[in-house]
């Protein structure tokens, strides 16, 4: 008789554990989106704001537009091409925020792109993680 009671108790414990495992927990983890995309009114562009964690995970780096040989220069890694073949870079008007800007590339020398037209010297641009910014803006790979 005692042997049957042990099996019955074990069965109740296992059934109880199974029932609690199937419960929906009200304290679900909060979903944090790594990027917030806000359309810029009056244009086709969007403002991409990343969380600190997203910047860390992407190992995102920035540099400034500088001048060399009387032309604006950016790292070649800053450039991204859209489906129409237009060339863009991501400027950073404020911390963790990026806005795509059209550029006209004159030529590339090594790891530098010399621009005919683009943002002013001193503008902060993304130099690493550019493809990921583009993907976030257009929800590519999501």
Spans of features found by a protein language model:
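Sec-dependent bacterial lipoprotein signal peptides
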Residues: 1-22
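Mature extracytoplasmic domains of secretory-pathway proteins
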Residues: 68-74, 78-95
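Short alpha-helical boundary/capping segments at helix-coil junctions
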Residues: 3, 22-60, 88-109, 114-142
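Alpha-helical interaction segments
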Residues: 12, 27, 78-81
């Amino acid at each position: 008789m005692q042997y049957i009671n042990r099996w019955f108790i074990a069965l109740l414990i296992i059934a109880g554990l199974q029932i609690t495992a199937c419960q929906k927990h009200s304290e679900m983890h909060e979903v944090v989106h790594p990027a917030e995309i806000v359309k810029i009114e009056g244009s086709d562009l969007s403002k991409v704001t990343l969380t600190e964690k997203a910047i860390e995970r992407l190992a995102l780096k920035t540099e400034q537009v500088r001048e060399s040989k009387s032309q604006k220069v950016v790292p070649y890694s800053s450039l991204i091409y859209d489906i129409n073949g237009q060339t863009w870079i991501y400027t950073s008007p404020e911390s963790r925020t990026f806005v795509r800007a059209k550029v006209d590339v004159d030529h590339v020398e090594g790891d530098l792109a010399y621009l005919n037209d683009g943002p002013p010297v001193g503008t902060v641009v993304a130099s690493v993680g550019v493809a990921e910014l583009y993907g976030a803006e257009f929800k590519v790979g999501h």
